[in-house]
């Protein structure tokens, strides 16, 4: 029985090969065209990969030179620092405009935002953090960019905007590594608005859901003042 099965399978394979062989004989030109087209497509893919890697490497080298020039200047006055920052931002933007993929294209806005943030230029930093989050919503850094833009809004005393951004994080990125941070920041925002019920709700989420979080101590301290404020009002 086993031998018969093997023979049947062998016959099927042989018949299939014969069909292919007959097709090739009957359609030599078509077969040749298919083979040539396949080879051309394969070569095109290889060339594309090589070009992609070469261009991305060239862009990264250029990007690193821009950052080295910006960070490498020491003992300069504030006007010179501002000029260096402006030039670096312009150069990164130009590099991004000329690229359609790769590290620089994906992360340029985040780099610019960080440069502005480190100089306490919160309006500009917020703009670029949000640009990055809009362009790369699936990036690991997208929730961090939105969180930073919310902090920038706080520095700019745009508290309603801050709350909206933290709520956006809760809606879209609650499964990110920033979950405890999101709850803590929302608690802070509601505490600032004297919404004790909502503030306590978010603080409790940290204490019950993340008992080993680095935010627990800060949360307990804030809840203590919440209780004090509540008693004071009564």
Where do the model's predicted regions map?
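Acidic, polar-rich low-complexity tracts and alpha-helical solenoid repeat scaffolds
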Residues: 1-234
């Amino acid at each position: 029985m086993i031998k018969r099965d093997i023979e049947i399978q062998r016959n099927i394979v042989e018949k299939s090969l014969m069909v292919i062989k007959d097709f090739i004989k009957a359609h030599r030109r078509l077969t040749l065209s298919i083979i040539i087209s396949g080879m051309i497509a394969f070569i095109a893919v290889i060339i594309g990969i090589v070009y992609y890697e070469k261009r991305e490497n060239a862009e990264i080298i250029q990007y690193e030179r821009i950052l080295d020039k910006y960070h490498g200047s020491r003992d300069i006055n504030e006007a010179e620092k501002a000029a260096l920052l402006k030039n670096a931002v312009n150069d990164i933007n130009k590099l991004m405009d000329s690229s359609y993929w790769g590290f620089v294209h994906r992360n340029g806005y985040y780099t610019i935002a960080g440069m502005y943030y480190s100089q306490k230029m919160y309006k500009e930093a917020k703009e670029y953090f949000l640009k990055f989050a809009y362009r790369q919503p699936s990036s690991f850094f997208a929730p961090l960019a939105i969180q930073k833009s919310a902090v920038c809004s706080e520095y700019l005393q745009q508290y309603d905007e801050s709350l909206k951004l933290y709520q956006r994080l809760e809606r879209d990125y609650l499964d990110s590594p920033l979950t405890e941070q999101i709850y803590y920041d929302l608690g802070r925002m509601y505490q600032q608005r004297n919404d004790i019920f909502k503030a306590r709700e978010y603080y409790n989420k940290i204490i019950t859901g993340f008992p080993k979080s680095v935010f627990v101590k800060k949360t307990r301290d804030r809840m203590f003042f919440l209780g004090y404020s509540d008693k004071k009002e009564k």
